[in-house]
Amino acid sequence: MRPRSALRYSLLLLAFAASAAIQAQPKTLAVCTEAAPEGFDPARYTSGYTFDASAHPLYNALAAFAPGSATVIPALAESWDVSADGLVYTFRLRQGVKFHSTDYFKPSREFNADDVLFSFQRMLDPQHPAHDLSPSGYPYADAMQLRDIIERIEKIDEHQVRFVLKHPEAPFLADLAMPFGSILSAEYAGQLIARGKGDELNSKPIGTGPFVFTRYRKDAQVRYAANPDYWKGKPAIDHLVLAITLDPNVRVQRLRRNECQIALTPKPEDVAALRQDPQLTVLEEAAMITSHAAINTRHEPFDDPRVRRAIAMGFNKSSYLKIVFGDQARPAIGPYPPMLLGYDDSIRDWPYDPERAKALLKEAGVAPDTPLNLYISTGSGPGGNPARVAQLIQSDLAAIGIRVNIHQFEWGEMVKRTKAGEHDMMLYSWIGDNGDPDNFLTHNLGCASVESGENRARWCDKGFDEAIRKARMSNDESQRVALYKEAQRIFHEQMPWLPLAHPLMFDAQRKNVSGYRMSPMSARDFSRVKLD
């Protein structure tokens, strides 16, 4: 070979080797998230921040929602049958599904019916050995009164289970697709309980999902590795990092510097500038969200509906929407967004009328300068900057004689304090989990949810509760619509919440990211993401 040809050949070999080395480098997706997870057992929590770090990357449920929709599709159950009376659900389980293998657990078997029974019976049976591993109970199961819905769960064989209900439950399949229905390993839980380390079920998670838990640095980041045995196929990325970044400005800065490839929920006012950046893409979703302020109806004088209506009429919602969201949200009038079944568009919002609000407060015997303790979280989510929203409420209510004291806490601390009922008012954004109105109503406003602490308004109206109970049990859509409209009318008169907005949701990503899709239920799925 002549020297020049040999040199050219050597250069080609080096170029090929370099290209192969680049392709072989592990691909890591870093996502800047809004808050730290409270734990890693989805049945114990209700926060989307927690589900982003637990249910979605680590677990699967029997059913799932089709990407970008609320349509229920098979997951760990490959198919099911429902009896004509709506009382018996028979699930055929997917075979060949493996649980995660880690340094702290090596499964000896594949997913089967025992795991389904364990995952649900621990929530339903107070005598179950794993029941008390969650000191605060199981908020979804408790608020939805799952014990009053499910008569029993039967193992037919290794790959079939049967749920027998006490009465028909219209959203039951959609409920099972929610994060609280994530399936855990009965084998792993049994080993932990036997060693007296049951708490590790919440800190060292084992699931069947697309990513395997690696480690958590509290309030900083969560790390995962791609699951090589994932039943849908190994994800295209090798590692996933959730970088906890409370400040939305910092999330955007980190995205621009390529420290994160996806930044969740940038501020609505930043969206236009982000769209002008040639390195970035902005994703938008008309999500199922109601941002609101829950009013504690067990605290005087807020136990009087006249006072709650006065608060509604004393708040300039139009100004709030412009300041916080620009044109990126519509006003909320009721408890759930217009896209859901039975939304009553005939109900008109309470008008902004400070003078009428003052008259109502006087009629109710409320003294001028009455204090109201408003609890908010740090950071910023789909409901905008909590501190800014709180300041607007504070300013408007001061004009009608209510002195708002703002108390700001880290997310988990605020959740704990408001479950205990410390607050007079709490800022919150509820994102629908299953595309059914019941998810907004029973969980957040039902009487049973007062006891579980999930009903932050601590409001129990028997007429409202009966309407949503009947709607939940009916498979007649027209009947459900009528009942939900009745419930909305009661809500509007009683005003346990100050409904604020139905915001659009935004995420931003770098141009080299593909395969990420937002969900109307705000479920973040990174298993399909590719980095170019």
From Swiss-Prot:
Instruction: Give an example GO molecular function.
Output: peptide transmembrane transporter activity
Do you know which InterPro entries this protein is assigned to? Peptide/Ni-bd, SBP_5, SBP_5_dom
BP GO annotations? dipeptide transport; protein transport
Query: A single GO CC term, please?
Result: ATP-binding cassette (ABC) transporter complex
Q: Which UniProt keywords apply?
A: Peptide transport, Protein transport, Signal, Transport
Question: Which N-terminal residues, if any, form the signal peptide?
Answer: 1-24
Q: Which domain of life is it from?
A: Bacteria
* Subunit text: The complex is composed of two ATP-binding proteins (DppD and DppF), two transmembrane proteins (DppB and DppC) and a solute-binding protein (DppA2). Five orthologous SBPs (DppA1-A5) are present in P.aeruginosa, which increases the substrate specificity of the DppBCDF transporter.
Role according to the record: Part of the ABC transporter DppABCDF involved in the uptake of various di/tripeptides. Shows high flexibility on substrate recognition. Efficiently uses tripeptides.
Instruction: Give the family, as the similarity comment puts it.
Output: Belongs to the bacterial solute-binding protein 5 family.
Stated name of the protein:
Di/tripeptide-binding protein 2
